[in-house]
Amino acid sequence: MSGSALFNTGNVWLNPASIAQNSSLTTSLFYSPSPFQLPQLSHFGLTTIKNFDRMNFAAGFTSFGFSLYRETVFSFTAATMFTESFGAGINVHANHLSIQSYGSATTTVVDLGTIISPIENFNIGFSLNNIGRSSFGADDDIPQIFITGFSYMVMEKTTIAVDIVHDVRYSTGYRAGIEFSPHEIIVIRAGTQSEQSQLYGGIGIKIFSFQIDYGIATHTELGLTNSIGITFSN
C-alpha cells in the first residue's frame, strides 16, 4: 500500500525514509502498460534495496512515455533509523526528458523525508520532493511537492494510511487507503484520492520469497488503469 508514513520499500518514490527499516535484499518492479487505456503513457520501474549495517541504500529506474516523448529517471536512495522511532532518508534523481524533434534535457532532483513513530502502530511521515525546485527549463515542469502522511495499524491485519499532498502548482489534496490481510499470503487494498476523483483497488499474493501485486485505478472520464508489480526479498 502507498503512503508517505509507511515503512514499505515500495514507497521509496514518495518518501525516501520508507526503506529505513529494510533488513533484506529486496528487488521490485512495476509495469503499467496502458494508463487510461493509452499505451503512449506506459510506465515501468525497477528498484533494488540493500542493507549495509545501519544504512539502507537503493538504486532505481523508471521510464514513462513512448518514442516521441519519454521521461526517464535514475535514482539513488540512502536511509537509516536514527532511533527506534525515527528514520530519515534522501533521494537523488537524474531526470532525463527526450522529445523527438525538440531534443533532450537532464537535471538533478533531490527529495528528503522522515518517518516518526510516536506511539506503537502509529506513524507520521514528512517528505519534500524536489527540494531545490529543479526543472528542465520551464518553471515548475518538475513539481515541488510537500507530503504529510499518517498511518495506523487498526488491528493486526488492517492498516489505514492518509496523505495530505501539496503540489505548489495546485491546491492541497489528499490520498487515503486501507490494507487488509485476511490470510498470511493475501493482501487486499482499496483507496481514493481527491485529484480527479480516482478510486483504487488491488490484491497482493505472497509466494515464498515473492509477492505479486495487481492494481486497478478508475477515472471518472478517462477509464481504467491496470498495473502489476513483483517483489523479491531475500
Regions found by a protein language model. Give the residues of each.
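Subset of outer-membrane beta-barrel
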Residues: 1-234
